[in-house]
């Protein structure tokens, strides 16, 4: 069984703030998921061709088209900090400016 401390550690690494209820819920859910993965490891896949997709098909693609967004100020209004038309975020890498 996954320990609650492990969920807290992963949440910290992902910069997530979890409530006590969420920690308990995620501990249970992740324990179930890991148990299922262990079941999958027991399957005999000898002779089974590796696949990338369940269905043998390619999804259609389209060219990228840049379009101006009509309400830039509305988007930037949600930014905790900004510089002109850009979101301002804390520096995470050391180095020259």
Curated annotation (Swiss-Prot):
Enzyme class: ligase
InterPro entries membership: Asp/Glu-ADT_sf_sub_c, GatC
GO molecular function: asparaginyl-tRNA synthase (glutamine-hydrolyzing) activity; ATP binding; glutaminyl-tRNA synthase (glutamine-hydrolyzing) activity
Reaction(s) this enzyme catalyzes, per UniProt: L-glutamyl-tRNA(Gln) + L-glutamine + ATP + H2O = L-glutaminyl-tRNA(Gln) + L-glutamate + ADP + phosphate + H(+); L-aspartyl-tRNA(Asn) + L-glutamine + ATP + H2O = L-asparaginyl-tRNA(Asn) + L-glutamate + ADP + phosphate + 2 H(+)
Enzyme Commission numbers on file: 6.3.5.-
Entries under Pfam families matching the protein: GatC
Keyword Chloroplast: no
Keywords from the named record: ATP-binding, Ligase, Nucleotide-binding, Protein biosynthesis
Keyword ATP-binding attributed: yes
GO biological process, one term: glutaminyl-tRNAGln biosynthesis via transamidation
Domain of life: Bacteria
HAMAP family recorded: GatC (MF_00122)
Subunit field text: Heterotrimer of A, B and C subunits.
Role this protein plays: Allows the formation of correctly charged Asn-tRNA(Asn) or Gln-tRNA(Gln) through the transamidation of misacylated Asp-tRNA(Asn) or Glu-tRNA(Gln) in organisms which lack either or both of asparaginyl-tRNA or glutaminyl-tRNA synthetases. The reaction takes place in the presence of glutamine and ATP through an activated phospho-Asp-tRNA(Asn) or phospho-Glu-tRNA(Gln).
PANTHER family reported for this sequence: GLUTAMYL-TRNA(GLN) AMIDOTRANSFERASE SUBUNIT C, MITOCHONDRIAL
Record-stated family: Belongs to the GatC family.
Protein name: Aspartyl/glutamyl-tRNA(Asn/Gln) amidotransferase subunit C
Natural source organism: Synechococcus sp. (strain JA-2-3B'a(2-13))
């Amino acid at each position: 069984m996954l320990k609650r401390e492990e969920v807290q550690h992963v949440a910290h690494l992902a910069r997530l703030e979890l409530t006590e209820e969420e920690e308990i819920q995620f501990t249970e859910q992740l324990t179930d998921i890991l148990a299922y993965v262990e079941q999958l490891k027991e399957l005999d896949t000898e002779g089974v061709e590796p696949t990338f997709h369940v269905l043998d098909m390619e999804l259609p693609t389209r060219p990228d088209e840049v379009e101006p967004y009509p309400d830039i100020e509305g988007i930037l209004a949600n930014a905790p900090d900004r510089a002109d038309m850009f979101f301002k975020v804390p520096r995470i890498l050391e180095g020259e400016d």
